[in-house]
Amino acid sequence: MKKILCICLSSTLQRSISFKTVALEKVNRSEYYRYDASGKAVNSARVLTQLEKGCAVVACPLGERNLSLFTDLAARDNLELSYVTIPGSTRECWTLLDRTAGTTTEIVVSEPVLEADEDLKAVASAEIKLLKYINDVLPEVDAVLLAGSRPKIWSDDLYATLCGMTHDNGKIFLADYIGEDMKKTLAASIPDIIKINEEEFRATFPECNDQTLEQAIIRKSQELNNIIVITRGCDSTYAADHGQFYECPTEKVNPVNTTACGDSFNAGFLYEYLQTGDLDKALKKGTWCAARNAELETPGAIHA
């Protein structure tokens, strides 16, 4: 069995709330809701666990105030969870599902930024513990999936450090993040796989904006000597492997909850790529997982 370490610094408690309809500036009464342990890499880990139980392990920080809720939800989904605690609460995201319109609206409820000296010392200690755990487990896994934004309480170069640690252990690193974290990573150690969407690619590599997307990812993957995968919503997915271009059509589905479709794609893609080394098969598996996720209420799932 191939094993994947899923690292999530933006752990989330996801509340998916179902409405017959959602109307702005009105009182909206829900039909029901569900809670899930979430965050981009956590969602990917849930899909991986459904693909093959035991193939994924999650490393993440969790707020101490609502710790048990997150760990109970993770246990319900058979997630192998290794965590460090930090002051405060794990943030929540609320997904509003409009059954009539078939739309998904996500509200991210950010927690107050930790600024007290005592809290920051606790975070620094948690970061050391997290890095130690990751360093210890890297020899036991085949790849690392690092996805999502880095809260400002963590070291500026943490993502670059994690990519370097992964490569020092001879493992594959998939990066699903952008901005300064991606720039610092590229300056230190090139991710084997960069998977982002078209808007994120254009923002991260503005020097490519005078090229078509196909030309841009071909040239950038040649320059970086890696794999770049660009999802484009309902449109086909583009990819380039060291300059060789690939395209994979999406599946048409009747969506229930589109939250975590990208995370589900990451899971299927990396799972299949580790099994076969075949990029075309990996793109198809990622697409299949994203489509199955869209048909379900659970964020990051391929079956109920």
Where are these regions (language model features)?
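Gly/Ala-rich phosphate-binding loop of Rossmann-like dinucleotide-binding domains
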Residues: T49, L186, L274
